[in-house]
Amino acid sequence: MKHLVTTALAYTNGPLHLGHARSTYIPADIYTRYLRLKGEEVIHVGGTDNHGVPITLTAEREGVKPIDIVDRYHNAIKADLDSLNVSFDTFGRTHSDIHIETAQEFYSKLKENGYIYEKEIEQFYCEKCDMYLADRYVEGICPFCEGEARGDHCEVCGRHLEPTELVNPYCIHCNSKPEIKRTTHYFFKLSAMQDVLKEYIENSPEMPEHVKNMALRWIEELHDWDVSRNIKWGVPIPGCDDQVMYVWIEAPIGYVSFTKQLGDLWKDYWLENTGDSKISHFIGKDITVHHAVFWPGILKGIGGYKMPNAVVSGGYLTLENKKMSTSKNWVVWVKDFIENFSSDYLRYFFMINAPLNRDTDFSWDDFQKRINTELIDIIGNFTHRTLVFTERKFGSTPVVDLNQLKDEDKKLISKCEDTLNRVDSLIREYNFKDALMEIIHLAKEGNGYFQGMAPWAIKDEERLKEVMYTCSVALKYIVYLLSSFMPEKTALLLEYMNEELDLEVRGNPLKKPKVIFTKVSDEDISRMKENLMKATKKAETKSDEKSKKVKSGEKMDIIDIDYFGNIDLRVGQILEVEEVPRSKKLYKITADLGDEKRQIVSGLKGAYEAEELVGKKVIIICNLKPAKLCGVESQGMLLAAEDDSIVSLLALDRDLPVGSKIH
């Protein structure tokens, strides 16, 4: 059987961090290396995703073209992957002729097959910039937690948002308030695929169970999918001058277009009726639905393509038990890690720390402990003492009469063969943690055998040869099985053993071994922790400076008196104050405006006790568009001033009746 292994396309808006490495790239490389080790035909396809709003935003901030950002980070990402010893047979980019042509062919075929249609939608439009605003071009206040949020996501509370849900939205280019207009977008009729996709998922025996369950839940409520965007940077929609394909319809097509870079070979892996092949997609958990539902839907809509056999979804990675954040620099970049430690140590730690489908944490202390007390004290100990003792006593691996081996020798060799079979099954099931545990257990058995045989005390040279031959067999199996996980260290071991990467022990002359596995020192860990805190502090300083600029009004536009006159400001009096459920900041306030009572949601909790507010006369904006905060409708806004942690309601210096207008 042929194997096609793909990794999620890295987005060219920044370099890789440890989360990317753990969920996707390291496990995919281990799987590919193992299949190749077993003599199976496999190609590993990877590349970068180069389109979409975040790239255009970065380019605009830096005053360069989007292609400049793409080129920079495509090269940086490839360098990061090389440093992790993640290798590919083909590595492409979506901003290339072959990809754009392939993506447009897919789109046209979907349209020809009746799966693309036009539909009017509501979208923010900026009059000042004369453009429709994609989700990342709009920012405002999260309606759930009152944090600053983007049009698609609130980083404070983690919720997915629609741009039109934002409170006080503004265009990120000019800071003016956008209006909602109707525009025509193109939709993929994904809802028509419900039965087909359900059958596909239920009849995919190699699909991991947690992926199946997630996909089936989504398929139950399948909706059509908006697949166009009003931006210029992307794959142009055929026959449309002002919209491009949404990245999540065109980026997965990269798996096909990048395989095409290998020539006609691509057909054997992707087209139906071209032989037996297996497709495995390695991805992060956050894009499971895109690969298990949307992408198969596209392939079904095109027709004639093989379907993915497995979507291998890696869990989230936290850092020191906190969610990673690139904007806050609470992250460890691959480049920074590799400058200080072997990539093999990272590959080992991530695969042994937790099953791939589970979320896990990267802690510098745990990393040190795992490497020193597990990898080095068990595997490193057995490999080093076997090589050193054998080289010193014999200069080469002993050749013995296998019929003369004792039961205890045969027991360890039998353990090697059992481990080989178990590791094979586990890796093919994408169970990398348990596969690695089997190798560790074999090394433990080897250490126990070495210690029990006490070769330093054996006087009979033939018996000593049998013992060290048995240790060398175990060593060869460990190196063979470990090679997919730790290619650098095992290559060094093979060099000292003067052996090939197979299971045969040839009796070759040994090279004088050096220490291969070196411990991670306390000084190393202290330095990395300190670097992390410095980077985070630097990001906090930048964030504080940005907040001060906003507070000082540096971003505000000049307005005329007529504009100000449109704001209905009146004196109100607070009658009742209640806490808003699930919110740490919000009160639900009932205010008297003279001719009516209003419900207002305000973030004064923590600054004022509820009883302090009752009876206060305040200034209220009365003609603000109603908005929901944490599910509670707010029909106005109380005015307050803020400086760092101090919040103060605006008050009158003379008593005026409620309802009085402010000019």
UniProtKB/Swiss-Prot annotation:
ATP binds at T326. Its main location: cytoplasm. It is found in: Cytoplasm. GO terms for molecular function: ATP binding; metal ion binding; methionine-tRNA ligase activity; tRNA binding. Binds 1 zinc ion per subunit. GO terms for biological process: methionyl-tRNA aminoacylation. Keywords: Aminoacyl-tRNA synthetase, ATP-binding, Cytoplasm, Ligase, Metal-binding, Nucleotide-binding, Protein biosynthesis, RNA-binding, tRNA-binding, Zinc. CDD domains: Anticodon_Ia_Met, MetRS_core, tRNA_bind_EcMetRS_like. A motif ('KMSKS' region) lies at residues 323-327. Its EC number is 6.1.1.10. A motif ('HIGH' region) lies at residues 10-20. Zn(2+) binds at C142, C145, C154, C157. GO terms for cellular component: aminoacyl-tRNA synthetase multienzyme complex; cytosol. NCBIfam families: metG, metG_C_term, PRK00133.1. Homodimer. This is Methionine--tRNA ligase. It comes from Methanococcus maripaludis (strain C5 / ATCC BAA-1333).
